[in-house]
UniProtKB/Swiss-Prot annotation:
Enzyme class name: hydrolase
TM spans (from-to): none
GO biological process: DNA catabolic process
Keyword set, alphabetical order: Cytoplasm, Exonuclease, Hydrolase, Nuclease
NCBIfam families per the UniProt record, alphabetical: PRK00977.1-4, PRK00977.1-5, xseB
Name of protein: Exodeoxyribonuclease 7 small subunit
Any one Gene Ontology cellular component term annotated for this protein: exodeoxyribonuclease VII complex
Length: 88
């Protein structure tokens, strides 16, 4: 059986990472461990629960980044008018 940190049955007890990159790296590690098929059932369920939480963190961070880009871009995000390019 795998005895790595990824398969730790206490993964649900650890605090969630607050940054996208750390959450994504942990999520990828959990997915890899589950895909190997060597985790016992309880550890697989624990890893799956943790993975769902990490996926939510990633989705939230991406949504926040998208909102920041929209705010920064403001009116610049509009369809391209080819006729306007001809006038220049």
């Amino acid at each position: 059986m795998a005895s790595s940190k990824q398969a730790d049955p206490q993964t649900d007890a650890r605090p969630l990472p607050q940054d996208f990159e750390t959450a994504l790296a942990e999520l990828e590690s959990l997915v890899s461990a589950m895909e190997n098929g060597t985790l016992p059932l309880e550890q697989s369920l624990s890893a799956y629960r943790r993975g769902v939480e990490l996926a939510r963190v990633c989705q939230d961070r991406l949504a926040q980044a998208e909102q920041q880009v929209k705010v920064l871009e403001g009116d610049l995000l509009r369809p391209l008018d080819p006729a306007a390019l001809d006038d220049e």
